[in-house]
Every structure is written in structure tokens, then in C-alpha cells.
Curated annotation (Swiss-Prot):
The lineage of its organism: Archaea, Methanobacteriati, Methanobacteriota, Stenosarchaea group, Methanomicrobia. This is Tetrahydromethanopterin S-methyltransferase subunit D. Its EC number is 7.2.1.4. It is an enzyme of class 7 (translocase). It catalyses: 5-methyl-5,6,7,8-tetrahydromethanopterin + coenzyme M + 2 Na(+)(in) = 5,6,7,8-tetrahydromethanopterin + methyl-coenzyme M + 2 Na(+)(out). Belongs to the MtrD family. The gene is mtrD.
Length: 250
């Protein structure tokens, strides 16, 4: 057990880094919750965990698919990031269409007077009694950045767990079988999803409701969530490495 941990310190560090990136990335994602669903708050009308998990799982699937065709680490991580970015971008743009053409409101933020990216006035278009509505440009860009961080983090965790399985398998039988189709790939994926969910839930308590993106005052709370995620990711990494080692590796 101790040997398994000491022999996979590098991959455990990558798992922790991945968890931190996920936690940090969640703070970038514009989440409006139930108020946004009624066009009374800026962001996507769903919860923090649901939105972050959707992007993260898409990134994990993209990274897993890329591992079928290459073992190039940068390509695998980039694939995870792009997959997550596409998912969150499509979600936000479709949401914007509904807000604009369905509800009939202009995407605007109540947190800033001027959009930091487009420099367009925001306060003129915020309806009375609301905290903004739709997904303005700054929130869209922020969401794509957050998805990229989440995708990279999820890919790091998944890749690291696969490498742990491969290294344990090499030590036990002297030769490793193909990763594709191996039963422990499912175990690694489940652990990766679990670690992702843990690090997505922590920021949701930190945010405490809605957040518009990196321009939102709540974004400044991210260091607290990151510290908590480091601790949680260490525990998750230890459990995951021990479990995969005890199962015999890949």
C-alpha cells in the first residue's frame, strides 16, 4: 500500500493539480441558478455543479477518446480542454438565443456598468427588479475559460489514474496489456468523475448562489476553494491510487 503511494507520487501530484484547476475553473462559469431560468439573473439557468460537471464529463470523454489513438500527453489534455469548451460554449449560446428571441431580453450584467470586453453599457438594459439577464460577452468568455480549466483538470486526473494502473500492472506481470478495453479503465473513469464532482461541489459552497464570471465580486473568493480542493484532492488521490493498486493495475 505504502509502496503504491510512493511509487506514484508524480501522478498523485497531477491528480491534485487537476483538482485545483477544476475548483478554480468553476468560479469562471456563469451560473444563474433558478433566477436565471426566469431571466432574473445573469448566467445559465442551472446549478454550479451541474454546469461544471457537464463540461468536465465532456472533457473526460474527449480525453478518453484521444487516448485510443495517441499517448501524447499534451494532445490528450488539449482534447479534454477543447471538448469541455465546446460543451459550455454551445450551452451558453443556445441559452442566449432563448433569452433574446424567446424571453425578449437583452443579455446584460448587473455587476458591472460596462462590459470589460466589449465596453458596452450594461446598466441601461438591466430590467427593474432583476440582477441582469442572459449571458453577456464577458460572462461567455469567462465560461469558456472556466470550461478549459475544468477540461484540463479532468484530463489530468484521468490520464494520471490510467498511468497508475499501467505502472502497477508492469510491476506485477512485467508486461502491460492494451489500455483500450481493459476493465480498470472503467474504474479509472469512475474515480476521475468522482474527484471531479468533489472539486465541483466545493466551489459551489464558496460561491453561495449565483456568479457571473471573473468580473463578479464573488470571484475573489476562489483562494479559499482552491485550498479546500488541495486537501480534498490529496485524500481522493490516496484512495484512488490504493484502490487501483489493489485491483492489480492495467
Amino acid at each position: 500500500m505504502i509502496d503504491a503511494i510512493l511509487g506514484n507520487i508524480l501522478w498523485m501530484v497531477f491528480i491534485i493539480i487537476g483538482g485545483v484547476l477544476i475548483s478554480w475553473g468553476v468560479h469562471f462559469v456563469p451560473v444563474g441558478g433558478a433566477p436565471a431560468a426566469m431571466a432574473q439573473a445573469t448566467g445559465v439557468g442551472t446549478g454550479t455543479v451541474q454546469l461544471a460537471t457537464g463540461a468536465g464529463l465532456t472533457g473526460l470523454v474527449s480525453a478518453g477518446f484521444m487516448m485510443n489513438v495517441t499517448d501524447n500527453f499534451p494532445l490528450i489534455v488539449a482534447s479534454g480542454a477543447v471538448g469541455a469548451m465546446i460543451m459550455i460554449a454551445v450551452t451558453m449560446i443556445v441559452g442566449t438565443w432563448i433569452y433574446v428571441y424567446g424571453v425578449g431580453c437583452v443579455p446584460s450584467s448587473a455587476k458591472v456598468k460596462v462590459d470589460p470586453i466589449t465596453k458596452y453599457r450594461q446598466d441601461l438594459y438591466v430590467s427593474q427588479g432583476t440582477e441582469g439577464h442572459g449571458i453577456p460577452t464577458v460572462s461567455f468568455v469567462s465560461g469558456v475559460i472556466g470550461a478549459a480549466l475544468g477540461g484540463i483538470g479532468g484530463s489530468l486526473i484521468y490520464y494520471s489514474l490510467i498511468e497508475v494502473g499501467v505502472s502497477v500492472g508492469l510491476e506485477r506481470v512485467g508486461v502491460t496489456s492494451a489500455v483500450t478495453g481493459n476493465s480498470l479503465v472503467a474504474v479509472a473513469a469512475i474515480f476521475a468523475i468522482g474527484i471531479f464532482l468533489v472539486n465541483a461541489v466545493i466551489p459551489s459552497y464558496n460561491i453561495g448562489g449565483t456568479i457571473e464570471g471573473f468580473h463578479d465580486p464573488k470571484f475573489k473568493k476562489w483562494p479559499k476553494a482552491v485550498i479546500s480542493s488541495v486537501v480534498a484532492s490529496i485524500l481522493c488521490a490516496i484512495v484512488a491510487v490504493i484502490a487501483i493498486a489493489q485491483l492489480g493495475g492495467i
